């Protein structure tokens, strides 16, 4: 029998698979992508829904694991020999590139999920040959199994690499759970080719080199900057501007940036031994027999002395496997001449090098090489802001070591959220401002009777249901599941910058907070035994009480879950600049958009919902409920499809799907008029109308518009509301 005809499906229907067919988005490229709300579904996780990574990690013998990692550093393998017999530089780069994709604008990227294992990151040009680092780690991952995630192991390997070469790290916190499929919610740029320069179509730059938000890298497929300079132009001063912009977008200030660049380049080398054209395809494009290994190099042995990765070739200092101040000794000790590597990349070589500063070859002890610097490295010498910082570190090695230790810890933990999420015996005791610290609970909590009393006080205070709901939503909905920042805990809505955000209606917010503050003060003064309620708790409780009252008005008796225990942060514990990035440019749940963007309002809604870890049904029921509760920013009437506002009804869906209404554009919004009389019935935004326009969302809206869905609507709204109110309650999860 012909092998090609053995499959009955292929014989009957041809040999094309469904993957070769045009997808819906190929036919309709502007179709709203709701898939990002359902990625990482339980069905994709081989460990099962009941797997508790934190519990598993807490059984790990971290000391034994670290000893195995230390041993790995010098266990050079013939299939990928270690430079100078030590893999330290490779593992530092792996950890750095795992964490370094983080960006502050939306909190996405970073090392918190082990996403370097999957496309596109596993095949980014800047991640060349990091597949080898992960293969070197596999025997250790295999040994320790589920006690250590890939995400944690990659970061820990970087720490152990530093420690094995004489550096004292600041600490390590575990707790990064792995994902099992590529992330679809992250926008990496619009370019259609790797490493596209800024003059190419769909550039991420506009105007005077203005980098598109939320991006934090200068070219598609790079972590930060082009080491050869902007678009490959070897200009150290211009490179300094790129370095500053990209590192700032990863939450690093100038001192942290200098420490990271210099500290990271204290170790290892860059690889550009041969013609890049001799390097094979990346892992995702490699043939099946390569078994996921990419960048197979046909130059010489393909590894060791013949390795080509970035195209830049050489080491920065004479002792690349030991922590010392040699990087600054070289940077300031020599003049630098522009040259090209064997791979053709721009780099700089030290002139008139002393014999003791010549660097032994990484694989041939009979050879030595002068130190090299990249264009980006030289920005630390020629940028007017970086240069004095670098010289201070050069003169004060202890300050440099401390700055690098802290910056490395921040780099590798920035996307993990509050310190309470860190696991293991090496978590530093010191609270750091970028961790968004919140005071520890220091008083007895309110009980069920107190909760009932406080609800009654809030509802009798004169603050409306709409105001209570709006305030609670504004407080809780700052949460981002991308980097676990924001949320209601801390009551930072009463502090700068959140109290002044336009979306939070500062005047109304101040009034509500004043009333709630008086209730809090009165209750705490009268409560026995030191019992207290925090303002953070009272803000959420007020919203819960309002939802219950609105449900009663619709004929439904429901109890909204409430768990006390939130605390109030101080202004001193709140970095205003750091929190500024949490200000929403749009919040479709409140029908708010700061300005017109290239991205549609409905896409911004889905993006917000994804950051809130909501499913499409949860997003749908929340929008419908918040509209009728009157939570729109500025009291806008758009989308308030009800004649009984502040009542938790399914009116939004019923009236949206009413075929007696015809919709037409009216400026930036839409008017819904009676098809027969032409009478104006409603106004709406794109966010409102998408629930009738998009086929998937309309299907969900139909469920909630049904005559038998009134109770289900209330029940589902309460569940989704409760989820958002508790997204940052890592203390009770």
Swiss-Prot record:
Enzyme Commission code: 1.11.1.21
SUPFAM superfamilies, per the entry: Heme-dependent peroxidases
Cofactor note: Binds 1 heme b (iron(II)-protoporphyrin IX) group per dimer.
Annotated crosslink Tryptophyl-tyrosyl-methioninium (Trp-Tyr) (with M-250) location: 96-224
Any one of the GO CC terms: cytosol
Gene Ontology biological process terms from the UniProt entry: cellular response to hydrogen peroxide; hydrogen peroxide catabolic process
Cofactor(s) this protein cannot do without: heme b
Active site per the UniProt annotation: 97 (proton acceptor)
Residues marked Transition state stabilizer (site): 93
Catalytic reactions on record: H2O2 + AH2 = A + 2 H2O; 2 H2O2 = O2 + 2 H2O
Signal peptide as annotated in the record: 1-23
GO terms, molecular function: catalase activity; heme binding; metal ion binding
Domain of life from the UniProt record: Bacteria
Keyword entries, A-Z: Heme, Hydrogen peroxide, Iron, Metal-binding, Oxidoreductase, Peroxidase, Signal
A family per Pfam: peroxidase
Post-translational modification summary for this protein: Formation of the three residue Trp-Tyr-Met cross-link is important for the catalase, but not the peroxidase activity of the enzyme.
Binding site for heme b: 265
Tryptophyl-tyrosyl-methioninium (Tyr-Met) (with W-96) crosslink, residue number(s): 224-250
Oligomer and partners: Homodimer or homotetramer.
Summary of the function given for this chain in its UniProt record: Bifunctional enzyme with both catalase and broad-spectrum peroxidase activity.
Family, similarity comment: Belongs to the peroxidase family. Peroxidase/catalase subfamily.
Protein name stated in the entry: Catalase-peroxidase
Organism this protein belongs to: Azoarcus sp. (strain BH72)
């Amino acid at each position: 029998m012909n092998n090609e005809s053995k499959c009955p499906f292929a014989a009957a229907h041809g040999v094309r698979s469904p993957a070769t067919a045009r997808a819906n988005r190929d036919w309709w490229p502007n179709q709203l992508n709701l898939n990002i709300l359902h990625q990482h579904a339980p069905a994709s996780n081989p460990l099962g829904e009941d797997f508790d990574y934190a519990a598993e990690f807490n059984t790990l013998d971290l000391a034994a694991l670290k000893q195995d990692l230390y041993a790995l550093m010098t266990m050079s393998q013939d299939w990928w020999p270690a430079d100078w017999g030590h893999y330290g530089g490779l593992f530092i780069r792996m950890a750095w590139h795992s964490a370094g994709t983080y960006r502050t604008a939306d909190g996405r990227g970073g090392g918190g999920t082990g996403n370097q294992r999957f496309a596109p990151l596993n095949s980014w040009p800047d991640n060349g040959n990091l597949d080898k680092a992960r293969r070197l780690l596999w025997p250790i991952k295999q040994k320790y199994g589920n006690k250590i995630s890939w995400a944690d192991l990659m970061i820990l390997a970087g720490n152990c690499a530093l420690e094995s070469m004489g550096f004292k790290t600041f600490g390590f916190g575990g707790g990064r759970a792995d994902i099992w499929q590529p992330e679809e919610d992250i926008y990496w740029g619009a370019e259609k080719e790797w490493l596209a320069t800024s003059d190419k179509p769909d550039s991420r730059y506009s105007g005077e080199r203005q980098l598109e938000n939320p991006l934090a890298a200068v070219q598609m497929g790079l972590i930060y900057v082009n080491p050869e300079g902007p678009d490959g132009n070897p200009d150290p001063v211009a490179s300094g501007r790129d370095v500053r912009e990209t590192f700032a977008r990863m939450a690093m200030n100038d001192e942290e940036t200098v420490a990271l660049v210099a500290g990271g380049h204290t170790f290892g080398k860059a690889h550009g031994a041969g013609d890049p054209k001799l390097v094979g395809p990346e892992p995702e494009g490699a043939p099946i027999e390569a078994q996921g290994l990419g960048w197979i190099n046909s130059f010489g042995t393909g590894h060791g002395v013949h390795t080509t990765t970035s195209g830049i070739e050489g080491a920065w200092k004479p002792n690349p496997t030991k922590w010392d101040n040699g990087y600054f000794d070289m940077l300031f000790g020599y003049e630098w001449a522009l040259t090209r590597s064997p791979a053709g990349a721009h780099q700089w070589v030290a002139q008139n090098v002393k014999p003791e500063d010549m660097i032994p070859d990484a694989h041939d002890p009979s050879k030595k090489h002068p130190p090299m610097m990249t264009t980006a490295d030289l920005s630390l010498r020629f940028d007017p802001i970086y240069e004095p910082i670098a010289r201070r570190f050069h003169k004060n090695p202890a300050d440099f070591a401390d700055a690098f230790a802290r910056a490395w810890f921040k780099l590798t933990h920035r996307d993990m959220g509050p310190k309470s999420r860190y696991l293991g015996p090496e978590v530093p005791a010191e609270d750091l401002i970028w961790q968004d610290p919140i005071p520890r609970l220091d008083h007895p909590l309110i009980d069920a009777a107190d909760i009932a009393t406080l609800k009654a006080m809030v509802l009798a205070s004169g603050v409306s249901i709409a105001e209570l709901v709006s305030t609670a939503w504004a407080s809780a909905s700052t949460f981002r599941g991308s980097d676990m920042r924001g949320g209601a805990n801390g009551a930072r809505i009463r502090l700068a910058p959140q109290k002044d955000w336009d979306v939070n209606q500062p005047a109304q917010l101040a009034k509500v907070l004043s009333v709630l503050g008086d209730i809090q003060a009165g209750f705490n003064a009268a409560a026995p035994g030191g019992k207290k309620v925090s303002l953070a708790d009272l803000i959420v409780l007020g919203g819960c009480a309002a939802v219950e009252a609105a449900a009663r008005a619709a004929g439904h008796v429901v109890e909204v879950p409430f768990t006390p225990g939130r605390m109030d942060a101080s202004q001193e514990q709140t970095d205003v600049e750091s929190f500024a990035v949490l200000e929403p440019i749009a919040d479709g749940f409140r029908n708010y958009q700061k300005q017109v963007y290239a991205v549609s309002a409905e896409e911004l809604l889905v993006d917000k919902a994804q950051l809130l870890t909501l499913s499409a049904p949860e997003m749908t029921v929340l929008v419908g409920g918040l509209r009728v509760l009157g939570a729109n920013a500025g009291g806008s009437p758009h989308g308030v499809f009800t004649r009984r506002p502040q009542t938790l009804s399914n009116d939004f869906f019923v009236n949206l799907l009413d075929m007696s209404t015809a919709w037409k554009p009216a400026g930036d919004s839409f008017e819904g008029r009676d098809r027969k009389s032409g009478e104006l019935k409603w106004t709406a935004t794109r966010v409102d109308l998408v629930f009738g326009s998009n086929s998937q969302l309309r299907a969900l809206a139909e469920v909630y518009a049904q005559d038998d869905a009134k109770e289900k609507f209330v029940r589902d709204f309460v569940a989704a509301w409760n989820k958002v109110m508790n997204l940052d309650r890592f203390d009770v999860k």
